[in-house]
Amino acid sequence: MHTGLHSRLGALTLLCLLPMSASADFLADSQLSLETRNFYMNRDYRDADKPDTPRFRGLPKAKSEEWAQGFMLRYSSGFTEGPLGFGVDGLGLLGIKLDAGRGTSGTGALQVQRDGEVSDEFGFFGPTAKARLGKSVLTVGSHAPTLPVAFRNDTRLLPQTFQGAQIVSNDLDKLTLTAGQFRATRLRNSSDYEDMTMFSDGAGGGVASDRFNYAGVTWAPSSSLAATYYQAELKDNYRQHYANLLHGLPLAEGLTLKSDIRYFRSTDEGHTTVDNRNLGAMFTLMYKGHALGLAYQDQEGDTGTPFIGGGTDPWTLNTVTFHHFLRAREDSWQLRYDYDFAASGIPGLSLMTRYVSGDNFEIGGQDAREWERDLDIAYVVQGGPLKGLNLRWRNVAYRGSHTTDIDENRFIIGYTIKFW
């Protein structure tokens, strides 16, 4: 495991070296906030006789259930004055168990001990040093990336983080260049950094790795058109190419067609057997608060699309609340509907529901199918002393051939305090 001690010392050293005369922008542009998140999750295993049913001390579980309180303290400094500016960011995380009975761990929200029980609390501190030259920013330390080839997971109590270095440049007009290397990851329910692993259905030969290299470019000639390309490598596991086209087409007053096309090509690296081509397209009609989307995802090759294991979210179109629909050779389609109730005079209230179905794959040599139905209802308080308080209910039903069926509910209450 990696403790992050060197990055902490580096950040503290940088702070000490910053000249007081150059700290005007460093302090004036700084921000400090505290996000609180109350998280409850219940996952009911509908059939406990399947090979993939989670177990506790050898016996199949009937459910996983946890309730916890999370705190996320975020500090972001400005940059020192001059052509080359320096700054420091910091992320402090604390998760506290409120309730988790014996044998009900496993939602991914709380830290699990070796005996299968959960810790009463767990925490993490991650500093990040940064430097800016022109419109290019270099960051070294803890990151919470939202990259198509490495997307941090933030679907439970606390967010996942990665340790490494990244540079983002906007010096060229309409172009964003990104490159970096991650050396370790901290899972969403952990206090420590560790080596990265690969998940790819049907693939063999994966090993723990301390190198994830990536580089990409996004070209956005207008607000309605963007094209992206990334290349990535999890050393000794897989190589991956990613291409994406986003386009918004006005059809009539208030009516827009949004197109989102994504392609992944993944091959082996080291001694793995990764071989996957993933092409997905989603088309969404948007009109006065309504959004109706239809997606189709086709996979070819001997394995499923690979991604960094441990809860990292693959940036594929049919990765949804519970399942990712990335089994080897699996094809899947999605129907989604969103509604913003501000169009009906109720600002802050929103609804999302979707249905995803996958087939054309095998489990244990047998033909299989699966589907998932999701429902999200969220509300953000618009005024008064609780302005900004957000409440969300997530409901999931998953059914599949030769797999454990689940029904799931999540209740999330969040509030952010901005100190400055």
Predicted regions and their residues:
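Outer-membrane beta-barrel "beta-signal"
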Residues: A215, L335, L375-Y379, D405-W420
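Transmembrane beta-strand segments of Gram-negative outer membrane beta-barrel proteins
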Residues: D25-Y45, L84-V88
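Outer membrane beta-barrel
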Residues: Y75-G106, D115-D195, V217-L225, G293-G301
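Outer-membrane beta-barrel translocator/channel fold
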Residues: L175-D201, G206-A208, G254-S332, W393-F411
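Repeated loop/turn-to-beta-strand initiation elements of outer-membrane beta-barrel proteins
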Residues: L32, G82-F86, K135-T139, K174-T178, ...
